[in-house]
């Protein structure tokens, strides 16, 4: 089975163009998985997750890899305050744009913190969290 990514942009509020790759397989979709990458020089969804998306897609998941605001091919507003609320707002706008009512979130590093923040703000929209080397988690 060949899985071909489709690169697109979601035009969101304040002129934000959020870039994403969507991987569709030819089998019935089980659920939607959103991959949220971490930060760092050259960070993007594809650079973080290029070795993971095929496995999910081949199991029948609708798989979407986003470039978070400020990274990859997504808009990089210079006047924005890149807070957790900023990222979760745009993640929610993206899910609404794609008509996704519930998703599995996979977050790496900063992406994990965004996934946690999103799950806390919108618990009904997240079915599962998969976290890797996540920031924003306190040890108690």
Report each predicted region and the residues it spans.
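Conserved SAM-binding loop
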Residues: 43-55, 92, 105-114, 134
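Short amphipathic alpha-helical segments
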Residues: 47-48, 76-77, 118-119
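N-terminal cap/lid segment of alpha/beta-hydrolase-fold proteins
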Residues: 1-18
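Active-site loop/oxyanion-hole signature of alpha/beta-hydrolase fold enzymes
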Residues: 13, 21, 58, 62-106
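Flexible, active-site-proximal loop/turn residues at the rims of small-molecule/cofactor binding pockets
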Residues: 40, 78-80, 135-136
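Conserved hydrolase catalytic core segment
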Residues: 100-140
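Conserved HGGG/HGGXW glycine-rich cap/lid loop of the alpha/beta-hydrolase fold
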Residues: 16-73
